[in-house]
Amino acid sequence: MSKEDAMSTGDSTESLDIDCLDDGDSEVVSSLQHLADDKLHISDNRDVAGVASKWTKHGCNSVEIDYIVDIDNNHEDPQLCATLAFDIYKHLRVAETKKRPSTDFVETIQKNIDTSMRAVLIDWLVEVTEEYRLVPETLYLTVNYIDRYLSSKVINRRKMQLLGVACLLIASKYEEICPPQVEELCYISDNTYTKDEVLKMEASVLKYLKFEMTAPTTKCFLRRFLRAAQVCHEAPVLHLEFLANYIAELSLLEYSLICYVPSLIAASSIFLAKFILKPTENPWNSTLSFYTQYKPSDLCNCAKGLHRLFLVGPGGNLRAVREKYSQHKYKFVAKKYSPPSIPAEFFEDPSSYKPD
């Protein structure tokens, strides 16, 4: 649901005086609720109470039985959408395959730009989003727009930064409460482009996107997957959260990782973050497998690619992401040590080494 839809729904809805309902009214409300559930086709798949799967923990002296924990049992917080969360993310998994860039647009479409130019642009955009304190979703959405546009439209080097500015403008209008003004974006680009040029490029991008600005990003999935990863902790584990976000943001710079869908990058980022924090423990479990819908073997190639990126960095003078997560407010996670390799047994599926 778009922000506009959410706002219009909230504006047009009046609160009910529940205290005034008599027994007859209660029956009417109950029947309406059943009717609404039927119309919405709310899935029963989210009910995981009592569902369990066996999982062998490597790196431990004893075999541990791991149960799936229901992360959608908090009905107190309306923002968690506990009743609909499972179906929402099921829909997003389908949607992410439809709003993806080409995986080889640099080789097949573009003639004047290469992967390093793309990385430099995104590194600069990381600095801009930090400078203007934009939400992370704006950055991810900006990169999504850039890559999708480059997948079809040929662009020259001079207009590469212009494309980035225009996509940032669109994404910030979609995500931010107070998006930066066009004049501000012209200023941060050292006035390389005029206001009219930015607006013209914005129109070109919107036309190409057919004004469909909603797109599932890695950040979208990361939020829910982190909830599943921290289900055994009363308070959020900030080191895990920041480290997973750092790894995910590094992936934005790496062109070779475009071949992986956002949900897979999000799941692999959590896998790698948990491994870095506790190298002797199996980072995956049945709760993560259930809510991400990925087995350890599914994560293997993506997690290894992210691990290489974590070890060597994006290269060149691309320091924005590393410097960002080297700050105290992010618990210095960019400075964390990681073992040089991930044990192969961590990528084995439960059935491959322990029968049901």
Curated annotation (Swiss-Prot):
One of the Pfam families matching this protein, by short name: Cyclin_N
This protein's GO CC annotations: cyclin-dependent protein kinase holoenzyme complex; cytoplasm; nucleus
Family: Belongs to the cyclin family. Cyclin AB subfamily.
GO terms of biological process kind: cell division; G1/S transition of mitotic cell cycle
Keywords noted in UniProt: Cell cycle, Cell division, Cyclin
PANTHER family: CYCLINS
Record gene name: CYCA1-4
Species whose genome carries this gene: Oryza sativa subsp. japonica (Rice)
Name of protein: Cyclin-A1-4
Disulfide linkage: none
GO MF term set: cyclin-dependent protein serine/threonine kinase regulator activity
